Structures are given as C-alpha cells and as structure tokens.
Amino acid sequence: MILGTLMNSGKLSHTVAIILKALSLGYQFGFDIMEVTGLPSGTVYPALRRLERDGLVSSSWEAEEQALKEQRPARRYYTLTRQGKEAEGAATKRYPLLTRLIPDKWGKTV
C-alpha cells in the first residue's frame, strides 16, 4: 500500500530513490549516505525520518560502548524494511541509472 502511494503520488523522488539505493548497497549511517550521494544533511536526515515513519526504513542506535571506544557520538543505523526493499526495486525500475550512480559499500559499482 505504501509503495503504491509513493509511486502514484510522485513521492518516489530522485532524492528518495537515491537514499533507498544507498541503503540497499550497505550504507547504514546518515553520514555515509551523505558522503556517497553528495546530498546534504538537511536533505538526508528528514528523508530518513519520513521513510521510517512510512515503514520503509527502520533504525536503531549502535552500542554506546563502541562509540565511546572510538571517541565519537553514537551513530544511528538505518536499514530497509521489506516494504523499503520493494520501494528500492521500484525506484531502480523508475530510475535505472541509479544502478550506476552509487558504488556498493565494498567499492564496486553495480
């Protein structure tokens, strides 16, 4: 239902499609998504919140111990839900160049 709403309402924008693709390729942190896509934080984080609200993305905080060990703030992990994976597939069909735009987390472009 949400996927149909996204597709029909035009809310499956380039920005949302790029963020979904980045998540599908293993980028889990907002900063990583910003770095690989070139999108600013004022675009990425509100989009991630909307995607989470709409059930396409889930998030969780990393263990505080890891952040303390690395002397930095804790990061929030974002992952695609089942519906998010469906939306990413639809995004790839709608915007086929996404497959060449973002390298996967391990360095190869798919």
Segments the model singles out, each with a brief description of its role:
Residues 25-29, 53-54, 84-85:
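Short, charged/polar surface micro-motifs in flexible loops or helix N-caps
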Residues 36, 78-80:
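Short beta-strand element of the conserved SAM-dependent methyltransferase core
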Residues 1-8, 83-110:
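Amphipathic alpha-helical dimerization/coiled-coil segments
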Residues 74:
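Exposed loop/turn and edge beta-strand positions of beta-sandwich/beta-sheet ligand-binding modules
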Residues 54-71, 79:
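Beta-hairpin "wing" of winged helix-turn-helix
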Residues 22, 80, 87:
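Conserved SAM-binding loop
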Residues 6-45, 49:
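N-terminal helix-turn-helix DNA-binding core of bacterial DNA-binding proteins
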Residues 13, 80-81:
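Residue-level signal for threonine
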